[in-house]
Swiss-Prot record:
Its cofactor is Mg(2+). Its main location: cytoplasm. HAMAP family: PNPase. The keyword Isomerase does not apply. Mg(2+) binds at D488, D494. This is Polyribonucleotide nucleotidyltransferase. InterPro entries: ExoRNase_PH_dom1 (IPR001247), ExoRNase_PH_dom2 (IPR015847), ExoRNase_PH_dom2_sf (IPR036345), KH_dom (IPR004087), KH_dom_type_1 (IPR004088), KH_dom_type_1_sf (IPR036612), NA-bd_OB-fold (IPR012340), PNPase (IPR012162). It comes from the Bacteria. The lineage of its organism: Bacteria, Pseudomonadati, Pseudomonadota, Gammaproteobacteria, Moraxellales. Residues 624-692 form the S1 motif domain. Belongs to the polyribonucleotide nucleotidyltransferase family. GO terms for molecular function: 3'-5'-RNA exonuclease activity; magnesium ion binding; polyribonucleotide nucleotidyltransferase activity; RNA binding. Residues 555-614 form the KH domain.
Length: 697
């Protein structure tokens, strides 16, 4: 009798065969080993049987990790082992988390940990879709109140046709990289970047991916049934309906009034005062029954329902706007004198100070992946300090949220950057959020576009971003443009769109409820387009195209082409020559195999000096031309004269003077500087020189 009780399910998902397996590996957790094409991911789910005492939030943790052995590689670094999560691993952890979190019921506070480990990869495709499907399958057999399963799909657009789960080779030709996740009946999450595609193309990709993932959802359901998955016996905690009614009667109107205060800090102060009043009114001095916790919950629920009811009934939003109006904008560029490019973008109570720095190719980021090390010439770093929301907090490295927001902003900008062969600088953008009340990632997109143009980066088009929200109750719904932080928290959807006037460059969607129809998504996209165009128009009033020249403080870039056979002369023995040029001119030099030489100088003079030295080394000898030379060696039949770096010619004794001389040393000595003319260069590259009829200094 086997010690393993293995359950397997195989199905075809686009161009890939998918195998789900449980019962063989990591049997003390709810584990699924999923193989999709050439990728294998081990997903383990552990759920606590009960919630911790006093727990008032859902502690879900998702950790995605790539083992280097999966691709037959040994990690770098001193310890030669995997370290902290990379940025890519953090982003995929968030990608898995976002569609599963809203499928756990309100009030479920048991801790759940999901660990997805890539254990094998043929390096032809991303492992994120496999990890998401494996997580869905593991949760389906875990016995938790998970309202899944979910499916997930990557959608590309190649030659106008949607492609399901494209590999790396196909993605290189795609105008779209979109990941969509959802249940049988609803889309829950979208993450994408695009090359200025239309709203219809983006919506079509979302619907295509959702239709295709139904195969995976059906297979996971069958897999869970075969594995004997048991339904959860968790029961939602009951709430004190009598207390709910009393709170509503006493505070609904006051809360509604507080939500008309436009200034965030003043509004929060008013709501905190109302909460304290509710506690004083309804919580006894000796609270043995936990009434305080119930008041906290019901008060928050009343706030939630009040704001939503106001919006759906057509009342003004929290800050007095209607559903389509964008907050007041202020656009400034060139705000930092020494930065290569800078912008201060303010939208209501959200503000981003964004800078662009240009560097040479040696400043590029080296990224370690399972497929090997790659170079990234574009970076966008997003920082969200505690002071931006008027709070204190510990300053540390970037958190998951900051990494995710930075990547979204990067997606929004990347499609409009110039090609590397046209603009070979390394670009680093930093977005420091100085104020926040919703949509700071989209403010970062706007600020990035402005600072890039201020730095002189020739963008294909300016880009802007806007965050949309949704409130839906039954058949009634309202789509909100440019949402506040409160509207994000109290709404049913966070829908962020970035793009130019020509089309969408990034789309991110997180939906908290089912029932988001094609109609709602279409309304949201069209409303976002109108908002984006309004923001772009305001930005264009300040700066609409790149400055004609890059910042005077940025490194100067020059490019020349040399004979590929001369590359070794420029580099020199052991790199000595190029190192000497770099040290003398303080310029950075990059040479390609085809003879293209890129020179980055701290100043224009430094770049020109480096180019002059390179041209001196690589110049071709011209017959008939007179050169300043130096005698480097004297022999019986003449002298060898250096006329260019690395280039010597023979000055025969008969060509030293118009008169006959007996000994070379009667006229020349080693180290002597002379003017010589090139008589001839034979087919072996040997150079014949003469001093006859050449006036010497």
């Amino acid at each position: 009798m086997s010690m393993f009780n293995i359950v397997r399910k195989e199905f075809q998902f686009g161009q890939h065969q998918v195998v789900l397996e449980t019962g063989r590996v990591a049997r003390q957790a709810n584990t699924v080993l999923i193989t999709m094409g050439g990728v294998t991911v081990l997903v383990a789910v552990v759920a606590a049987p009960t919630a911790k005492a006093g727990q008032d939030f859902f502690p879900l943790t998702v950790n995605y990790q790539e083992k280097q052995y999966a691709a037959g590689r040994i990690p770098g670094g001193y310890g030669k082992r995997e370290g902290r999560a990379s940025e890519a691993e953090t982003l995929i952890s968030r990608l898995i988390d976002r569609p599963i979190r809203p499928l756990f019921p309100e009030g479920y506070y048991n801790e759940i940990q999901v660990t997805a480990t890539v254990v094998s990869s043929d390096k032809t495709m991303e492992a994120d879709i496999a990890a998401m499907l494996g997580t869905s399958a593991a949760l389906a057999i875990a016995g938790t109140p998970f309202r899944g399963p979910i499916g997930a799909a990557r959608v590309g657009l190649i030659n106008g046709e949607y492609v399901l789960n494209p590999n790396f080779e196909q993605m290189a030709q795609s105008d779209l990289d979109l990941v969509v996740a959802g249940t049988e009946s609803a889309v829950l999450m979208v993450e994408s970047e695009a090359k200025e595609l239309s709203e219809d193309q983006m919506l079509g990709a979302v619907l295509f991916g959702h239709d295709e993932m139904q195969i995976a959802i059906q297979a996971i359901n069958e897999f869970a049934a075969a594995a004997g998955a048991k339904p959860s016996d968790w029961v939602a905690p009951a709430h004190n309906e009598e207390l709910r009614a009393k709170l509503k009667e006493a505070f609904e109107a006051k809360i509604s009034e507080a939500y008309t205060i436009a200034v965030k800090q003043d509004r929060y102060a008013a709501l905190d005062a109302l909460h304290a009043e509710a506690v004083a009114q309804f919580v006894p001095e000796e609270d043995v029954d936990g009434i305080a916790d119930e008041v906290d919950y019901l008060f928050e629920d009343l706030k939630y329902r009040t704001v939503r009811d106001n919006i759906l009934s057509g009342k003004p939003r929290i800050d007095g706007r209607d559903t389509k109006t964008v907050r007041a904008l202020d656009v400034q560029v060139g705000v930092l004198e020494r930065a290569h490019g800078s912008a201060l973008f303010t939208r209501g109570e959200t503000q981003a100070l964004v800078t662009t720095t240009l560097g040479n190719t040696r400043d590029a980021l080296m990224v370690d992946t399972l497929a090997g090390t790659k170079t990234d010439n574009f970076m966008l770093h997003y920082n969200f300090p505690a002071y931006s929301v008027g709070e204190t907090g510990r300053e540390s490295g970037p958190k998951r949220r900051e990494i995710g927001h930075g990547r979204l902003a990067r997606r929004g900008v990347q499609a409009v950057l110039p090609a590397a062969d046209r603009f070979p600088y390394v670009i680093r953008i930093v977005s420091d959020i100085t104020e926040s009340n919703g949509s700071s990632s989209m403010a970062s997109v706007c600020g990035a576009s402005l600072s890039l143009m201020d730095a002189g980066v020739p963008l294909k088009a300016p880009v802007a971003g806007i965050a949309m929200g949704l409130v839906k109750e039954g058949e009634r719904f309202a789509v909100l443009s440019d949402i506040l932080g409160d509207e994000d928290h109290l709404g049913d959807m966070d829908f962020k769109v970035a793009g130019s006037a020509n089309g969408i460059t990034a789309l991110q969607m997180d939906i908290k409820i089912e029932g988001i129809t094609e109609e709602i998504m279409e309304v949201a996209l069209n409303q976002a387009f109108a908002g984006r165009m309004h923001i772009l128009n305001e930005m264009n009033k300040v700066i609409s195209r790149a400055r004609p020249e890059i910042s005077m403080h940025a490194p100067t870039f020059e490019v020349i082409t040399i004979n590929p056979d001369k590359i070794r002369d420029v580099i020199g023995k052991g790199g000595a020559t190029i190192r000497q040029i770099t040290e003398e001119t303080k310029a950075a030099i990059d040479i390609e195999d085809n003879g293209t030489v890129r020179v980055f100088g701290e100043t224009k003079a430094a770049a020109k000096a480096a180019i002059a030295k390179i041209q001196a080394i690589t110049a071709e000898v011209e017959p008939g031309k007179i050169y300043d030379g130096k005698v480097i060696r004297i022999v019986e039949f003449g002298a060898f004269v250096n006329i260019m770096p690395g280039t010597d010619g023979l000055l025969h004794i008969s060509q030293i003077s118009n008169e006959r001389i007996a000994n070379v040393t009667d006229v020349l000595k080693e180290g002597q500087e002379v003017k010589v003319q090139v008589q001839d260069v034979d087919n072996r590259g040997r150079i014949k020189l003469t001093m006859k009829d050449i006036e010497q200094a």
